[in-house]
Curated annotation (Swiss-Prot):
One Gene Ontology cellular component annotation held by this UniProt entry: cytochrome b6f complex
UniProt cross-references to InterPro entries, sorted A to Z: PetM_cyt_b6/f_cplx_su7 (IPR012595)
Binding partners and assembly: The 4 large subunits of the cytochrome b6-f complex are cytochrome b6, subunit IV (17 kDa polypeptide, PetD), cytochrome f and the Rieske protein, while the 4 small subunits are PetG, PetL, PetM and PetN. The complex functions as a dimer.
Its biological purpose: Component of the cytochrome b6-f complex, which mediates electron transfer between photosystem II (PSII) and photosystem I (PSI), cyclic electron flow around PSI, and state transitions.
Disulfide bridge map: none
Originating gene: petM
Transmembrane annotation, as ranges: 19-37
Protein name, per record: Cytochrome b6-f complex subunit 7
């Protein structure tokens, strides 16, 4: 977290938290979608 604040000194914690949540939700959605495709493909 401190490393991110050093790279982006202008970004406050709310923006960083929102970005991390959106990024993790996207990764979760992609992995879930690929899992469903694999199950349906079998």
């Amino acid at each position: 977290m401190e490393l991110i604040k050093q790279i982006f000194p202008f970004a406050n914690s709310e923006i960083i938290t929102a970005a991390v949540v959106c990024f993790s939700m996207t990764l979760f959605g992609l992995s879930l979608g690929f899992g469903l495709l694999k199950v349906q493909g079998e």
